[in-house]
Structures are given as C-alpha cells and as structure tokens.
C-alpha cells in the first residue's frame, strides 16, 4: 500500500486503484476513532467514494483528517477529525490553514461547513480561523434517541490578501500536508 501518512491526496496525487480499498479502510478506521460517540462516522464505502471522486480532496496524516468537496468556486468541509490525544495542540487550526491555502491556489472563493450547535470545541476552532456564521439548519444532526441538534452554517471568504497572513506559515503547513 502506498504510504498515505503526511500526505494530501488529490487528483494529481491519488494512489493507484489497487490501493483504494486498503486506504479507504484506513481512513474509515481513523475517522471512527475520532468520532467514537457519534453517528457521524464515515464508512469504508463512503471513504472509497471520496477517494474515487475528483471533486473531493482529502488531507490525511497519522493524527488528522479532513475531506473537502470542491466545485467551481466553492468548497465544503465535509469532515475534520483530529485524534483525541492530539486535540488542543493547534493541529486542527493548522489543517484548516493548509486547506484554505490549497483552496486559494485553485481559485476557490468560499469554504463552507456545518457544525452542530453543541460542538463548542469545533465552533471555537472555526471562529479562531476566521469563519463567520451565515445560517442555521434546524434538526440537522441526529443525536441518537430521536433528538436532533441544529447545525450552524459557517463560511470563510478566500480572498487574496485575507489569506496573506496564512502564507507566513506556508512552509510549516506544507511540511504537515505536502501538496505533492
């Protein structure tokens, strides 16, 4: 299997077809360990879909994972996961900065995401990076026992100049998530 640690997997740097099943299992296992108390985990089948679809860009190393869906001028953060023992160390923040720089390099203008109103840690992270609230989806997330949590919709405007401050961290970020 191709070593997928410390890698950005995209259409230019995707593993060969023979490795997809093994890599999708690795990604699904990692995601499940990060979301142990949630039904919001992605299966091997879902990860395989993300790997095979050129509209999805996957950032992965041994301690973090992010999947984004990219369209003509927008992107959506599908999931962001950091290993529980590695949280509150700036890893999620650095991962988001890497994603934003990548999106700027391919002329994406906005990054959107949905986050549960109950996920205070993630909300703090997104606020720190510079996301702003732009909407609310009522009852978006299932919470088990038929409870539903609302989702806050957030956006980050990727405009040359706004992301300029991130570029000072570019070398450090590229070491974490090389773009191949």
Please name every model-derived segment:
Residues 9-14, 21-87, 93-98, 102, ...:
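Acetyl-CoA-dependent GNAT
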Residues 114, 127, 132-149:
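Conserved catalytic-core motifs of GNAT/GCN5-like acyltransferases
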Residues 103-114:
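Conserved GNAT acetyl-CoA-binding A-motif
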Residues 89-90, 114:
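Helix-adjacent hinge/juxtasegments
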Residues 92, 96, 119-122, 139-145:
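Short glycine/proline-centered loop/turn elements that form peptide/ligand docking sites
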Residues 82, 116-117:
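Short amphipathic helical patch at the helix-1/turn junction of helix-turn-helix
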């Amino acid at each position: 299997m191709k070593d997928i640690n410390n890698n950005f997997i995209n259409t230019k740097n995707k593993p060969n077809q023979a490795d997809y099943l093994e890599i999708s299992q690795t990604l699904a296992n990692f995601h499940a360990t990060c979301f142990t108390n949630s039904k919001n985990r992605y299966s091997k089948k879902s990860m395989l879909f993300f790997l095979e679809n050129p509209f999805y860009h996957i950032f992965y190393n041994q301690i973090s994972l992010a999947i984004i869906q990219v369209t003509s001028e927008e992107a959506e953060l599908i999931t962001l996961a950091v290993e529980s023992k590695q949280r509150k160390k700036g890893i999620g923040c650095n991962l988001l900065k890497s994603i934003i720089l990548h999106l700027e390099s391919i002329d994406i203008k906005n990054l959107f995401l949905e986050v549960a109103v109950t996920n205070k840690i993630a909300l703090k992270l997104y606020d720190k990076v510079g996301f702003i609230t732009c909407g609310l989806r009522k009852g978006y997330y299932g919470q088990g026992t038929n409870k539903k949590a609302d989702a806050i919709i957030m956006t980050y405007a990727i405009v040359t100049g706004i992301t300029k401050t991130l570029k000072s961290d570019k070398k450090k970020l590229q070491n974490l998530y090389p773009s191949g």
